[in-house]
Every structure is written in structure tokens, then in C-alpha cells.
Amino acid sequence: MFKIGDIQLKNRVVLAPMAGVCNSAFRLTVKEFGAGLVCAEMVSDKAILYNNARTMGMLYIDEREKPLSLQIFGGKKETLVEAAKFVDQNTTADIIDINMGCPVPKITKCDAGAKWLLDPDKIYEMVSAVVDAVNKPVTVKMRMGWDEDHIFAVKNAQAVERAGGKAVALHGRTRVQMYEGTANWDIIKEVKQSVSIPVIGNGDVKTPQDAKRMLDETGVDGVMIGRAALGNPWMIYRTVQYLETGKLKEEPQVREKMAVCKLHLDRLIDLKGENVAVREMRKHAAWYLKGVKGNANVRNEINHCETREEFVQLLDAFTVEVEAKELQNAKVG
């Protein structure tokens, strides 16, 4: 367990902020599987200040999710500070996180996201201004560098600490790598040794064993899990249990997976309405179905679903089909 500012986390497992994924429906589901902290998807500072309707919806927080970190991004100090003040005063988020890791060109060309990684002095200036303007603890999520020739992870993390930031989450890849190659955990270890604020490691934590290895090898305070949790909140539960007991829980059976998928769908419908939710849930269903044998047909059919009823019927029929095959195989065996 560790604290970010005055916010106590019940364990060391953190859900990463993933754009287009980490809305309240997904976060709450992951929270119920034991995450110590969940992070909301990044929100544009300018969109907050323009009072954009879609963006205001992205700021919605279910109190059952807490503690929660709400992430903002931007390239100008003035707008970032004003957006942070809005989040501070108008949401129940526990932590305000600043994105310095997003590698996507449309973000970096606005001098936001990973573009900050090139200038530790700018990081200090921006973080300091936000810290001075808000009451909630401020954290930063960053990558280790822009490219192999511009890795300032230690200086950047130290700048965050000097500016009053309460924690750093570090992804061990450069901006140029995007999500390719392997994460450099040695850099994460260096950063942990260079600052006294909590450091959360991120990158290539695909199994509970990976999480323990990251903690052991780098000394970080927490592990951040992103893509491995897509359609798989059991990854969070199994990691928490493994870190606490040393025992590995079994993977879920298809009926349990489809039940949670349906719960996720219903929460998304409550959040966004049936039309939007069903379409958005198609990608999530593909993730929930990953690893289940014979899922090709149902995935294809789900991609044409327009209603909750269709969606649920397909998942239920697939569950019965898989269980029948498993029973048949057990008899043969």
C-alpha cells in the first residue's frame, strides 16, 4: 500500500488511463475486481474550457470508483491551469494527472502529451503552475523519452518532484516506439532511485507474475496495467491476489466472462444510451472473447449488432455452445 499525497491506496495495482476505453462503466468494473486506483481517459484542457458536452460527459465519476485519478492534457500553461482548476472545483476526482506520455501525432503536434518529454524545464514550469492552482494532489504520467537519443526520464521525474507533483507513472517506452518493442524497466528503476515521491511502473505487465517481477526488479511503489486489462478485469484481481498471497488464481470460465461482459454493456448503456453503447461495446466484446476457442463467428456477428437484445442473445448462445463442447470433450476424455 502507498499514498499519493493524502490519498491512501489499498494496494499497488493501478488501472492505466486508456483513451476511448476508461470511461466510468469500464473503470467501475475494474474497480470491483480490486484495483487500488483507477485512472480516467485523458481529457483535453481546451475541451473542458469550451464546456464541450462530450467532454463534460467524460468527467462523470461514479462514487464507487474512488479513489480515482482524472487525467488532463494540453500544451499551454494557461489553459492547462484553468482546466485543472475546473477539475479541482467541479469533480470528485481524488487526483489530477497530467499526460506527458501520449505518443499520438495529433496530440504531440499541439505541444501536448509526449512532446513535453524534450524539456524538463517546461515540465517544472507547467506542473508547478498546476500544483499552485489546485488543492487535489497532482501526478504525471510520462514515457521514458522522445526517442533513444532523447531520454530525460530522470531529469523529467525530478522536475515533477521539485514542482510539487505527488507521484510519477512511467511507461518504459519512448514516444517513437509507440507500443512496439519492449519496455525498458531499467529506466524505471533509475527513476525510482532518483526521486522520493512514489513511482508507478508501466509497460509490458501482461501477467500477475510480470507485476511481481516489475516490483521486485525496479523497486517501484505500484504497477500500472493497461492493455492486459482490456476485456480482462480478472487480470487486476489475479494480480492483486498473487501479490498478496503468492498464489495464482485460475482464469475465468466462459460463463463468468460473458456475464461480466453483459454487466459492462449495461453500465455503458446507462452512461451513453443504447445506440452508442452497443456500437462502442463491440470492441470490448472482442477483448472479452479473446482466448475463448471458436469465437470467430460470434465476434463477426457482434460487429453487426444494433441492440442490447441482439448482443445478449449472441453472448448467451455462444456460452451454451462452448459449454456443450466442453462437456462433450470431458466425456470423450
UniProtKB/Swiss-Prot annotation:
Protein name per UniProt: Probable tRNA-dihydrouridine synthase 1
Any GO molecular function: tRNA dihydrouridine synthase activity
CDD domains listed in its UniProt record: DUS_like_FMN (cd02801)
Record-stated family: Belongs to the Dus family.
Superkingdom of origin organism: Bacteria
Named cofactor requirement(s): FMN
Native source species: Bacillus subtilis (strain 168)
Documented EC number(s): 1.3.1.-
InterPro entries: Aldolase_TIM (IPR013785), DUS-like_FMN-bd (IPR035587), DUS_fam (IPR001269), DusB-like (IPR004652), tRNA-dHydroUridine_Synthase_C (IPR024036), tRNA_hU_synthase_CS (IPR018517)
KW Zinc (keyword) present: no
Catalytic reaction annotation: a 5,6-dihydrouridine in tRNA + NAD(+) = a uridine in tRNA + NADH + H(+); a 5,6-dihydrouridine in tRNA + NADP(+) = a uridine in tRNA + NADPH + H(+)
NCBIfam families documented for this protein: nifR3_yhdG
First-level EC class: oxidoreductase
Lineage of the species this protein comes from: Bacteria, Bacillati, Bacillota, Bacilli, Bacillales
Keyword line: Flavoprotein, FMN, NADP, Oxidoreductase, RNA-binding, tRNA processing, tRNA-binding
